[in-house]
């Protein structure tokens, strides 16, 4: 029976993607099956920040996650992709502060805390909606009814529960320690939010007079101290030398007089000092330097804080002991001349005063890294402040063991070492932030400063037996964003309640994330989860079994994408396309550094002169998967994106060729499978095996390559061509076999490719399913192809491979000799093996049809061949007689001209590259391009010379 069928000439992604997604979502296909007898599979999405929109890094990681989710759903697993967004404390607060500043000329203080937080909730509703819509456009098969937010009621309760429990266990405490302080934003920030910028600075060499008549080994009455931070010297509490530095050993234990402040401070010995740095003597300022802080703790030094939270010089120094409490009895007066000075103004004055006192020895240029707050944009200050901390060492020990014991595996494995290096040197974690947006710390103070920790004020009064007459005020600070993010895998499943979902889907299966947050997020999730979530036997649960670490998506030049560089690409623009004008507006509008706009506009016009064409979601997803080689950074490639859009069109056209073939016969009756039918089924089985093996190793690039290779090179370029002679001249049984093979392989191919390219596969599958007798609603719910152990046909694979080599050799001879495909050729074989002779005997008709041959002959061992062009296939020699096909003299004349042309080009480039002036001045990229052209011309020349010899021999 022949089925009549019509199908559009081209696949139009914009016409089908959103409708298909809506159908999937409304049909509930993204929800877990709820089948408790099936294995569960769960991924918790790294929650995007609600600060704006998704970037290419999100699209990359989410494509990989959705591939795994769709694959496992098709495997029949009870599958959940748990999604949500992160409140992203400091980032979101800054976005909204900038917004009200630009639009209303107001600050958050004009609004007050409660009203400002309401403004942020409004922003979250808008931005979170944008993010979820973008995720839908990417095809993400998320159970949207389970979407969470790190500050929703359930997660807020989980955060309070964790804080209170850790405090009750003595693992959360409040203390005065050194933190990264942003003097512009007035908050402590994490190391992740500190950006170290290369800077041309100075190394000042100051003279610190020795006290009590002491002298150096060479008779000087002072030590020369090298520093990059003169403004903090008022807080010095020691100078340090290396214990083995013979220049200063006699002075260890003596004192110097701190200039300007006129107080004595000790000379101490510590191995931290680099004898080769400066003079080998350094000032120790424990209140204003992280390394000095550690030295100070080792030596019991007081900490003298001389800076305000604005980073101005204080009126009175704050003196703290190593226990973080005020220290009585230590005198450290700040001279009146410096009080109230901004830190860098103080630097200038201090240097000038050293010089006027004759205590400035020298100033040397010095390259250094200055820590900046990545959002405030000003240099951060190590600052002694009262903060809340988690004592994480007990949690870290358990988390380290989980990775050592392979309960959690990192892919690629080398990232385990990064994890271990951080975790084995872990410090207590500062979890408080001086912000308004975030989880308010569940601690209350009475008027005397006593601290009470509980889930809410009512519980505080009950827990601590406080009368309502006792006035309580909640801590103003909020928790570090990473604190709530650290609970993500289990809090989203209902913890602290012991829910069915928590039991069913935890531990989750894999976390896909970037290497830059292994410590800040991944490690903290492992620590928190293993501390709070236990299995039925009381054993700590891991949050996930595998951590797949991706590289960064960079631009085509390998630069990190950033707004300031103007090289950010929006994944939705890859899908829908964007005009040049709109792209320019997107890249240069509302810039923090408007002076860069023209440079960015110029680069954008050069790279995207016609804007960006629409490519559709499937092409974007396939490109991202194909570029996902394990752990490496990825240079984005628009040509690859274009190539994979062409691949999607190739799949559409191949499907159209199959389904609109009016000779397709799927009726019941005798079938006779051809060699080609057997071969393509075996090739498909091998492709399924490759895909499954690759996916199990998170080699998404190899999965994409397997599908591409089979679809384009085997199915389209070969099998479809191999069926044409069958439909033209085959008997009914052969046509039925080819028809069945075509539609069944196509249908299985669509299922194989669906996790990577869901839209086009669903659209084609809806058209194919009737041909194979399927009535199901969606490809999403169909089983993923299995490897069939009996499905490998090694004989068919070997025979077709040999025939392909022969056909390609004949086609190459045609191309090289300018013989039209329509002209029949004779083909002679010499030195043909017995095995290949048998293949030839069985498949002569197929070979004639595919290579457009009139006659095929095997020459006897002593038989003389006519003059012919020869090619080797293995040990066999293929000969195509040329008599009558070409005008020998004319062809040799034409080839002579071509040879001269190529020789001239090779010579021209050789001269250019041997020109020392050119090589010295030209950019490396230009020289590389010339060498590339030289190789191309040389290769072309050699091929034409081979053709010349072949024709000359006729």
Swiss-Prot record:
Pfam families: Anticodon_1, tRNA-synt_1, Val_tRNA-synt_C. GO terms for molecular function: aminoacyl-tRNA deacylase activity; ATP binding; valine-tRNA ligase activity. A motif ('HIGH' region) lies at residues 48-58. HAMAP family: Val_tRNA_synth_type1. Catalyzes the attachment of valine to tRNA(Val). As ValRS can inadvertently accommodate and process structurally similar amino acids such as threonine, to avoid such errors, it has a 'posttransfer' editing activity that hydrolyzes mischarged Thr-tRNA(Val) in a tRNA-dependent manner. The keyword DNA damage does not apply. Keywords: Aminoacyl-tRNA synthetase, ATP-binding, Coiled coil, Cytoplasm, Ligase, Nucleotide-binding, Protein biosynthesis. It is an enzyme of class 6 (ligase). One of its GO terms (cellular component) is cytosol. This is Valine--tRNA ligase. A motif ('KMSKS' region) lies at residues 560-564. Its EC number is 6.1.1.9. Monomer. ATP binds at residue 563. It catalyses: tRNA(Val) + L-valine + ATP = L-valyl-tRNA(Val) + AMP + diphosphate. Belongs to the class-I aminoacyl-tRNA synthetase family. ValS type 1 subfamily.
């Amino acid at each position: 029976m022949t089925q009549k069928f019509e199908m559009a000439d081209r696949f139009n992604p914009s016409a089908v993607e959103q409708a298909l997604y809506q159908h999937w979502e409304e049909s509930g296909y993204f929800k877990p099956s709820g089948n408790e007898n099936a294995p569960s599979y769960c991924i918790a999405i790294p929650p995007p920040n609600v600060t704006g929109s998704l970037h290419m890094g999100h699209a990359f990681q989410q494509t990989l996650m959705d591939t795994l989710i769709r694959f496992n759903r098709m495997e029949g697993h009870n599958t959940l992709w748990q999604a949500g967004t992160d409140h992203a404390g400091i980032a979101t607060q800054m976005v909204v502060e900038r917004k009200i500043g630009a639009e209303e000329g107001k600050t958050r203080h004009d609004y007050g805390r409660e009203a400002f937080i309401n403004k942020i909730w409004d922003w979250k509703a808008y931005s979170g909606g944008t993010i979820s819509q973008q995720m839908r456009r990417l095809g993400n098969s998320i159970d949207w009814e389970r979407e969470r937010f790190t500050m929703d009621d359930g997660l807020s309760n989980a955060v309070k529960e964790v804080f209170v429990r850790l405090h009750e266990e003595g693992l959360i405490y409040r203390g005065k320690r050194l933190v990264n302080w942003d003097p512009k934003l007035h908050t402590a920030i994490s190391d992740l939010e500190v950006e170290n910028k290369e800077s041309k600075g100075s190394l000042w060499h100051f003279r610190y007079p020795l006290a009590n008549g002491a002298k150096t080994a060479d008779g000087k009455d002072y030590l020369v101290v090298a520093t990059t931070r003169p403004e903090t010297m008022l807080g010095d509490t020691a100078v340090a030398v290396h214990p083995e530095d013979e220049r200063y050993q006699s002075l260890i234990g003596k004192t110097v007089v701190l200039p300007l402040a006129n107080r004595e401070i000790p000379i101490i010995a510590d191995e931290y000092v680099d004898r080769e740095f400066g003079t080998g003597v350094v000032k120790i300022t424990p209140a204003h330097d992280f390394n000095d802080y550690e030295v100070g703790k080792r030596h019991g030094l007081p900490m003298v804080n001389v800076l305000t939270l604005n980073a101005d010089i204080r009126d009175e120094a704050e003196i703290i002991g190593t226990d973080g409490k005020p220290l009585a009895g230590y005198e450290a007066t700040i001279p009146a001349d410096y009080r109230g000075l901004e830190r860098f103004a103080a630097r200038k004055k201090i240097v000038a005063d050293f010089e006027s006192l004759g205590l400035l020895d020298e100033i040397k240029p010095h390259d250094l890294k200055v820590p900046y707050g990545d959002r405030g944009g000003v240099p951060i200050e190590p600052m002694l402040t009262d903060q809340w901390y988690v004592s994480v060492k007990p949690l870290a020990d358990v988390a380290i063991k989980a990775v050592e014991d392979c309960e959690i595996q990192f892919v690629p494995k080398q990232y385990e070492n990064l994890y271990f290096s951080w975790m084995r040197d872990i410090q207590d974690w500062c979890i408080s932030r001086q912000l308004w947006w975030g989880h308010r710390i569940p601690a209350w103070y009475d008027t005397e400063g006593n601290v009470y920790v509980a889930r809410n004020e009512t519980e505080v009064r009950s827990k601590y037996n406080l009368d309502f007459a006792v006035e309580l005020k909640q801590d103003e600070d909020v928790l570090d964003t990473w604190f709530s993010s650290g609970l993500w895998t289990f809090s989203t499943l209902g913890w602290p309640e012991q829910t069915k979902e928590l039991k069913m889907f935890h531990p989750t299966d894999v976390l896909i994330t970037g290497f830059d947050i292994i410590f800040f997020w991944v490690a903290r999730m492992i620590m928190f989860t293993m501390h709070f979530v236990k299995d039925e036997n009381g054993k700590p649960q891991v949050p996930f079994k595998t951590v797949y670490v991706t590289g960064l998506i960079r631009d085509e030049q390998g630069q990190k994408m950033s707004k300031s560089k103007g090289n950010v690409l929006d994944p939705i623009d890859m899908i829908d396309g964007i005009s040049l004008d709109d792209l320019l507006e997107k890249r240069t509008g509302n810039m923090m550094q408007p002076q860069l706009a023209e440079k960015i506009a110029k680069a954008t016009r050069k790279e995207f002169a016609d804007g960006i064409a629409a490519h559709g979601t499937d092409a974007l997803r396939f490109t991202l998967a194909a570029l996902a080689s394990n752990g490496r950074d990825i240079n984005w490639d628009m040509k690859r994106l274009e190539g994979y859009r062409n691949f999607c069109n190739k799949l559409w056209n191949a499907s159209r060729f199959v389904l609109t073939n009016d000779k397709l016969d799927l009726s019941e009756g005798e079938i006779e499978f051809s060699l080609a039918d057997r071969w393509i089924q075996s090739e498909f089985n091998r492709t399924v095996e490759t895909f499954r093996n690759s996916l199990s190793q998170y080699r998404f690039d190899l999965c994409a390559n397997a599908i591409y290779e089979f679809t384009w090179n085997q199915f389209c370029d070969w099998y479809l061509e191999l069926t044409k002679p069958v439909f033209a001249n085959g008997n009914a049984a052969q046509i039925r076999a080819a028809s069945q093979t075509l539609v069944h392989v196509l249908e299985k191919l669509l299922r194989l490719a669906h996790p990577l390219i869901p839209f086009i596969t669903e659209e084609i599958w809806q058209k194919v399913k009737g041909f194979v007798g399927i009535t199901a609603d969606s490809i999403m719910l169909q089983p993923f192809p299995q490897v069939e152990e009996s499905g490998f046909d090694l004989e068919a694979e070997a025979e077709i491979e040999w025939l392909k080599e022969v056909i390609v050799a004949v086609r190459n001879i045609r191309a090289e000799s300018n013989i039209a495909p329509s002209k029949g050729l004779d083909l002679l074989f010499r030195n043909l093996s017995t095995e290949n002779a048998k293949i030839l005997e069985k498949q002569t008709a197929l070979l004639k049809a595919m290579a457009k041959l009139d006659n095929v002959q095997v020459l006897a061992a002593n038989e003389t061949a006519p003059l012919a062009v020869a090619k080797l296939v293995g040990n066999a020699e293929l000969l195509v007689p040329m008599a009558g096909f070409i005008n020998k003299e004319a062809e040799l004349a034409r080839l002579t001209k071509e040879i001269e042309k190529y020789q001239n080009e090779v010579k021209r480039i050789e001269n250019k590259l041997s020109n020392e002036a050119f090589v010295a001045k030209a950019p490396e990229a230009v020289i590389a391009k010339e060498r590339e052209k030289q190789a191309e011309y040389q290769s072309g020349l050699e091929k034409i010379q081979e053709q010349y010899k072949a024709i000359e021999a006729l």
